[in-house]
Each structure stands twice: as C-alpha cells, then as structure tokens.
Amino acid sequence: MVREKVTVSTRTLQWKCVESRTDSKRLYYGRFILSPLMKGQADTIGIAMRRALLGEIEGTCITRVKFEKVPHEYSTITGIQESVHEIIMNLKEIVLRSNLYGTSEASVCVKGPGYVTAQDIILPPYVEIVDNTQHIASLTEPIDFCIGLQIERNRGYLIKTPQNFQDGSYPIDAVFMPVRNANHSIHSYGNGNEKQEILFLEIWTNGSLTPKEALHEASRNLIDLFIPFLHMEEDNLYLQDNQHTVPLSPFTFHDKLAKLIKNNKKIALKSIFIDQSELPSRIYNCLKMSNIYTLLDLLNNSQEDLMKIEHFRSEDIKQILGILEKYFVIDLAKNKF
C-alpha cells in the first residue's frame, strides 16, 4: 500500500494520488485529491466523475457459452460436480482485460478428473485473464469438458433474455464496468470569501484497470462529451419556428486542428487526442495501451518504437503516416535519434 501526505496548493489546480493498494488480483483501490477548488466546484466535478467512472468506461466480459448436448440451463452433466447454471455463474465472474472491439471467440477443452479454472480458457492474443485461479468447474470423472465462449467489449450492463438456443448456447448477463465503486467527499477550508474546497475521490476497480487508468479514461470520456459545446459557431446557433431546438455545427478532427495550429503547433499537438482522429479502433486501442493519448505523444515515438507495441503491424504504421501527412504535412521518424 502506498499512502502520501496530503498537501494543498494555494494557486495551481492539481490532482494527486494520495493512497493506492492492491487488495487482491480483482480488487484495486486508489484515493485521489483535486485542489484548490472554489466553493461548489468539488461537488460538480465529483458527481460527474463518479457517473463517468461507473457508466462510461468499457470492459470485457464473457457473454455467451455453448455446451454440447445440454437440454437446458439447469441440467446436470455426468462427471461434473456443478450444474450448467453454476458453470454459467462462474464464467460470469471471470475478469478479462483487452483492447478488443466488438465480439470474439474463445474456448475451453479439458480432460478430467480435475479442476477447470480461468487459466484453461484459450483466448485470442489481445485478451488477457486478470485472475487465472478463478474457478469454472470440477470434473469428477475422466470426461472431456469442451465449451465455446463469446467475448464482448461494451459498457454498463447487458441483461440477456433467458432462452434456450437450438445450438446449445446460453447467454450470460454481463457487467462490463471495470469500476466496482466510486465515492467522492469534500473538505472545505479557509474563511469567508477565501473559502476553498478539496475534492477526495475513491475508486475501486476489478483489476482490469488500475484506479489511475480508470480516472484517466473517465476524464477523457467527459472531455469528449463536452468538446462539441466548446467549438460550436455562434452564427450556426438559431431557433427554428420558436422551437427549443439548437442545431450544432458538425465538429471534425480537421476543424479543431486548423484552429489550434493557427495559434501554436505544439499546443495543437497536445490538444488533439488520438481517439478524435480517423484511426481505426484497433490501432487506437494499441496506442492507448502504450500510454499514447495525444498526437504529441505519438510524435515522440519513432516508427521503430511503434513496431514494438504488441499486436502492431506495418500496415498500422502506414495508416498513421497517412493521417500525419494529410493533416500535418509531417512524417514520423523511422528510428529514435
């Protein structure tokens, strides 16, 4: 466990991690502060951040399992201690980490007797198991236990309609949220008009993200939600026939880039996040896993550096070079100087 003394700046707004610990492979804790804030700001930020942490961050879950020759969910299988329903509940608890977008397939094929755990799942290369010891089933006889799995990345909850499928597959209710809980509290200090606030934010995650990573992703999601309001043109705001509708001008990556470059190119590079570019989701996720969030981060890496990223291909480099050439008329160095 890491714990730091809380020191409050009287001028510059800053955030800091004051406590972090790993309670288990599937339970991480972090405590953060943001200060100094004016009266009322801490509650505004705390409420928005908590909602973003719990509802806006994506996670990866097993959403379907396929058995062979199983008539219904509450069946028992000879040689297996658990019922089909119990196996489904065990699969629901398995925590995964990935940069997957959409759905993918996985499988388990084990010969008994013995215990089947999460480490027996055969996964695609871009999906990892957080806790390999998670239990799936107990095989009491020398039987072959083979099941197919569907893995999906999403956010929030996914409640499947209970039904039996002809192919022997069963849906699994999924809780995609990597943040288990988030709380905020406020400490006020100072007197009269000089009164200020400190925001304390506590985050518990399931191990697929650290609390710091969750805080960063929630912040990015909130920024993306508000960006259109920052860049709408006043001459495009109007009311139609006294109706309360306000059409917003379309805001593109190129629009934001053009405005920023007029002022300062370095600021522009720091202000453009790669998830706002035209990069495919798979490339974006690979970059994000390597802590590359802005175009400035990207340009601080050479082509050689990017090729060291897991699952990165030469075709991905070509796509990145194409976007840099199109919008910046610059190239990415092949090697680190």
From Swiss-Prot:
Q: Does Mitochondrion appear among the keywords?
A: no
Gene Ontology CC annotation, any one: DNA-directed RNA polymerase complex
**Record keywords:** Chloroplast, DNA-directed RNA polymerase, Nucleotidyltransferase, Plastid, Transcription, Transferase
Region Alpha C-terminal domain (alpha-CTD), annotated ranges:
264-337
Instruction: Please list the GO terms describing molecular function.
Output: DNA binding; DNA-directed RNA polymerase activity; protein dimerization activity
Catalyzed reactions: RNA(n) + a ribonucleoside 5'-triphosphate = RNA(n+1) + diphosphate
Return the annotated region ranges for Alpha N-terminal domain (alpha-NTD): 1-233
Where does it reside?
Plastid, Chloroplast
InterPro entries for this protein: DNA-dir_RNA_pol_insert, DNA-dir_RNA_pol_RpoA/D/Rpb3, DNA-dir_RpoA, RBP11-like, RNAP_asu_C, RNApol_insert_sf
List this protein's GO terms for biological process: DNA-templated transcription
One Pfam family recorded for the sequence: RNA_pol_L
Q: How does it assemble?
A: In plastids the minimal PEP RNA polymerase catalytic core is composed of four subunits: alpha, beta, beta', and beta''. When a (nuclear-encoded) sigma factor is associated with the core the holoenzyme is formed, which can initiate transcription.
Similarity comment = Belongs to the RNA polymerase alpha chain family.
Domain free text: The N-terminal domain is essential for RNAP assembly and basal transcription, whereas the C-terminal domain is involved in interaction with transcriptional regulators and with upstream promoter elements.
Q: What does this protein do?
A: DNA-dependent RNA polymerase catalyzes the transcription of DNA into RNA using the four ribonucleoside triphosphates as substrates.
The name of this protein is DNA-directed RNA polymerase subunit alpha
Organism annotation = Atropa belladonna (Belladonna)
The UniProt gene name for this protein comes to rpoA
